[in-house]
From Swiss-Prot:
Family of this protein: Belongs to the MurCDEF family.
Gene Ontology terms for molecular function: ATP binding; UDP-N-acetylmuramoylalanine-D-glutamate ligase activity
Pfam families: Mur_ligase_C, Mur_ligase_M, MurD-like_N
Keywords noted in UniProt: ATP-binding, Cell cycle, Cell division, Cell shape, Cell wall biogenesis/degradation, Cytoplasm, Ligase, Nucleotide-binding, Peptidoglycan synthesis
Pathway(s) the chain acts in: Cell wall biogenesis; peptidoglycan biosynthesis
Record's subcellular location: Cytoplasm
Record GO biological process: cell division; cell wall organization; peptidoglycan biosynthetic process; regulation of cell shape
PANTHER family registered for this protein in UniProt: UDP-N-ACETYLMURAMOYLALANINE--D-GLUTAMATE LIGASE
Protein name as catalogued: UDP-N-acetylmuramoylalanine--D-glutamate ligase
UniProt keyword annotation of Transmembrane present: no
Gene3D superfamilies tied to this protein: Mur ligase, C-terminal domain (3.90.190.20), Mur-like, catalytic domain (3.40.1190.10), NAD(P)-binding Rossmann-like Domain (3.40.50.720)
Reactions catalysed according to its record: UDP-N-acetyl-alpha-D-muramoyl-L-alanine + D-glutamate + ATP = UDP-N-acetyl-alpha-D-muramoyl-L-alanyl-D-glutamate + ADP + phosphate + H(+)
InterPro entries the record matches: Mur-like_cat_sf (IPR036565), Mur_ligase_C (IPR004101), Mur_ligase_C_dom_sf (IPR036615), Mur_ligase_cen (IPR013221), MurD (IPR005762)
Length: 445
């Protein structure tokens, strides 16, 4: 792919957009920058990084009317809008940073492990990266997990990696056509981002783009959407919490198995919750697909401590355990967190619902929850979706109030779980900030 003298507009000026500007400029493109809202201080900040960079703001159509050949989109901007469709129909090319990386690794021959899914993808990406590093591979962990892929590539100055471990969101996959992973997985499909997609099937089709090429498919045998993603002629490894598969959980013994072979006991896995057994099985299958030895992988699984804000015990007071799952930003993630915990629960839900249907939480909560506390802008919708299923629902103005009220009702042996099933931006700077407030509220009890 050549960019020499190509007029290129980079849309969206967060971390991904900045990395695309840097990469495209280095490769000879004539780059301009666009954001729907640009403050003077942001222009000055970016201008110091890129001498002579031209900025556009306001309507995207007005910017595109300046004769651009390529539109490089940040993940937060959907290409499903009339201005971008018209640009493509007039011969313009639309791509994102993952497509740019795909061109690099395809030419250079780097191996790629690609991970997506509604829930669990960050944990699996981190675990796979950890295992690859522990097994001695020169490993790059990047994508939706935090470091933009082109920022990582520029830092390496073109040096080939043994393996790239990529967490990919559906947004990143929308305009990715050339990525051919050595191994890939879609961990699961549940309602998320339905404010961006037509329906759940549309969302699943976008996720399935991760399986292009002829690499190993690692499939969740318990998920109907994932089962349907099997491609003819491909090597497939299936994992299951429900029945025998290539990798499966024997419920009676709590042992992860491959066929009849015992792999590891769930008691030896530091990560809490049954859903993390699925994460471990997927991670081992992905790592084996790039040639790593099973015995070493299983030993290193035992030392992986997981990620903050993902079903993380933060403390205990008078026998009541407090668990932070602030990263549970959709219904599927929260249902998985609830399913993986055995003790009676008081659950804190709410925030920005992103157009989700919360009724699946009725079944998840009904046999586990002693009480549910609702916060945030979409608390009324959650109440409507859960009303009438026998749950004790309490509206709280703040997260601090929810923590205090839950603790007042809890008894020794109970769990207070923050797993909001919603985005956080109505009340907090992000899920990490929401977690900080939860922890401080616990400490104040």
């Amino acid at each position: 792919m050549t960019f020499q003298n190509k007029k290129t507009l980079v849309a969206g000026l967060g971390g991904t957009g900045i990395s695309m500007i840097a990469y495209l400029r280095k490769n000879g493109a004539e780059v301009a920058a666009y954001d729907a809202e640009l403050k003077a201080e942001r222009v000055a900040q970016i201008g110091k990084m890129f001498d002579g960079l031209v900025f556009y703001t306001g309507r995207l159509k007005d910017a595109l009317d300046n004769g651009f050949d390529i539109l490089a989109l940040s993940p937060g901007i959907s290409e499903r809008q009339p201005d971008i469709e018209a640009f493509k129909q007039n011969g313009g090319r639309v791509l994102g940073d993952i497509e740019l990386l795909a061109d690099i690794v395809n030419r250079r021959g780097d191996k790629v492990i690609a991970i997506t899914g509604s829930n669990g993808k960050t944990t699996v990406t981190s675990l796979v990266g950890y295992l690859c590093i522990k097994c001695g591979l020169d490993t790059v962990i990047a994508g939706n997990i935090g470091t933009p892929v082109l920022e990582a590539e520029l830092q390496r100055e073109g040096k080939k990696a043994d393996v790239w471990v990529l967490e990919l969101s559906s947004f990143q996959l929308e305009n990715t056509e050339s990525l051919r992973p050595t191994a890939a997985t879609v961990m699961n499909i549940s309602e998320d981002h339905l404010d961006r997609y037509d329906d759940l099937l549309d969302y699943a089709h976008t996720k399935a783009k991760i399986f292009r090429g002829d690499g190993v498919q690692v499939l969740n045998a318990d998920d109907v959407f994932c089962r349907a993603m099997k491609r003819a002629g491909r090597e497939v490894k299936r994992f299951s919490l429900e029945h025998e598969a290539d990798f499966w959980l024997e419920r009676g013994t709590g042992c992860l198995k491959q066929g009849n072979e015992d792999l590891i006991s769930t008691q030896d896995i530091p990560l809490q919750g049954l859903h993390n057994a699925a994460n471990v099985m997927a991670a081992v299958a992905l790592c084996e697909a790039v040639g790593l030895p099973r015995e070493a992988l299983l030993e290193h699984v035992k030392t992986f401590q997981g990620l903050p804000h993902r079903v993380e015990k933060i403390g205990e007071k008078n026998g009541v355990v407090f668990i932070d799952d602030s990263k549970g930003t959709n219904v599927g993630a929260t249902a998985a967190a609830i399913a993986g915990l055995q003790n009676p629960l008081f659950v804190i839900l709410g925030g920005m619902g992103k157009g989700q249907d919360f009724t699946p939480l009725r079944d998840a909560l009904k046999d586990k929850a002693k009480g549910v506390f609702l916060i945030g802008v979409d608390a009324p919708q959650i109440r409507r979706d859960l009303d009438g299923c026998g749950l004790n629902l309490t509206d709280c103005v703040t997260l601090e109030e929810a923590v205090q009220t839950a603790y007042a009702q809890a008894e020794a042996g109970d769990i207070v779980l923050l797993s909001p099933a919603c985005a956080s931006f109505d009340m907090f700077k992000g899920y990490a900030h929401r977690s900080e407030v939860f922890i401080e509220a616990f400490k104040a009890l």
